[in-house]
Regions:
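Short substrate-entry loop that stabilizes the transition state in hydrolases
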Residues: 50-54, 59-96
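Short, well-ordered alpha-helices that flank and scaffold nucleotide-derived cofactor binding pockets
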Residues: 75, 79, 123, 149-150
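Alpha/beta-hydrolase fold nucleophile elbow
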Residues: 127-138
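Short glycine-enriched nucleophile-adjacent loop
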Residues: 141-151
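Surface-exposed, active-site-proximal loop segments in enzymatic domains
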Residues: 95-104
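Alpha/beta-hydrolase active-site loop
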Residues: 103-125, 146
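N-terminal cap/lid segment of alpha/beta-hydrolase-fold proteins
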Residues: 1-52
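Short, conserved glycine- and acidic-residue-centered signature motifs
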Residues: 35, 70, 107-110
Length: 151
């Protein structure tokens, strides 16, 4: 889906890519090719200090979207020498929050957004592909937890 996106050394910032809208994990496992395609977005940020290739942490927000405490953690990751990719699943779908409607953006949708970003970021010459992690808060924690599951 994103095979043609190539990032160059030093390239960071806002990234647009393709993802899809599987409603639940069943659709990821059995019908991902039938899920509607969307334009997804995120931010790749490198530490100010240090020399790559950098380990990377994919950061996934919770039901109330990105908030101040998430950014505090991200700053700590950057200061510790990690690159981060901040997944923006809600913005990609025009949703501000799922607190009142958890079905408007599901964990399955957010997982596909994260893994599609992984496909792109793992080809970046400044990323150490042997050191890739994921963290999430609340709903994003669900994405993080299930990302290690092998069916």
């Amino acid at each position: 889906m994103n095979e043609t996106i190539e990032l160059k050394s030093g390239q960071q910032g806002y990234i647009e890519y393709k993802s899809s809208n599987p409603f639940e994990f069943y659709h990821i496992l059995n019908e991902l090719d039938k899920a509607p395609e969307i334009d997804a977005q995120g931010w790749l940020i490198f530490p100010e200090k240090g020399k790559g290739p950098f380990p990377v942490i994919f950061c996934v927000h919770g039901s109330d979207n990105w908030a101040g405490h998430h950014h505090e953690h991200i700053l700590n990751f950057l200061e510790a020498g990690f690159a981060i990719f901040r997944v923006h699943s809600f913005d990609s779908r025009g949703v501000a929050s799922t607190v009142e409607d958890q079905m408007s953006v599901t964990a399955a949708m957010m997982m596909v957004d994260t893994f599609e970003a992984l496909k792109i970021v793992s080809r970046h010459p400044d990323i150490d592909t042997s050191r890739i992690g994921i963290t999430g808060w609340s709903l994003g924690g669900t994405v993080s937890f299930y990302s290690f599951w092998e069916p």
